Amino acid sequence: MTYQHVLTDRCDDVVTITLDRPEKRNALALDVMLEVAAAFEAAGSSDALGVVLAANGPVFSAGHNFGDMAGADLDAARELFEVCHNMMDTVQAIPQPVVARVHALATAAGCQLVASCDLAVAGESASFALPGGKGGLFCHTPLVAVARNIGRKRALELALTGDPIDARTAADWGLVNRVVADAELDAAVTDLVARAGRGSALSKGLGKRGFYEQIDLDQSAAYECAGELMSTAAMTDDAQEGFNSFLEKRRAVFTQYP
């Protein structure tokens, strides 16, 4: 499928989805978000083993497009945020690990998009912000994903002050996994997505789904959820192949996909 504001490319087992509206600072307008969600759905239904989310241009993403919201009625605003929620949920719903490749600024819904990815690598010049606290519309929905990455106090500091944080701080707070020199960003992303995608694709997909199902439950309910999933997953052919290959001291051959 061809998109207007998104590029997709597959190299070996990895699909790269690239925000490609640099003249608008990759603002997440309604049509852009629909395309991003569609691109992730397509990648998720493929036999790819990993997905990279990247961006072209001077920033990763400037967040929501104010042009969509200025003068909008309540129904239009609700539609905009429903589409946004669907896009964020789709990133986490696909079975493959998703790695954000972050350069320059990721702000507001752009920061939310990074937080929604399973993993993230940032160049050392990257920065992150929830600037609504300095303006007229608080970053209500970006806080949903960001707070789940960095906790209440740090998320509220970002949102209430509107101040950006640098890449090293983002890593210390848990918003990104690691920070590398800008020149090493592509290599670091390639390495991480390859390592995150190895093993049984079915097992990895079930593992990702199970993580998001249990992570916000209380501990007892989380163990019940994870225990049932792990029990049923142990019955799959790939799980049995993993057990047998270990016992037989040979390389496993996995054949199942989500």
Predicted features and spans:
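Conserved CoA-thioester-binding segment of acyl-CoA-metabolizing enzymes
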Residues: 1-56, 89
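Terminal low-complexity tails and localization/encapsulation signals of metabolic enzymes
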Residues: 1-3, 244-258
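Terminal peptide-recognition signature
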Residues: 17, 21, 36, 53, ...
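Hydrophobic alpha-helical membrane-association signature
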Residues: 32-35, 80-83, 113, 185, ...
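Structural motif
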Residues: 14-18, 52-54, 73, 99-101, ...
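Glycine- (often His-adjacent) and acidic-residue-rich active-site loop
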Residues: 34, 55-90, 106, 218
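Crotonase-fold acyl-CoA enzyme core
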Residues: 89-204, 231, 235-236, 241-244, ...
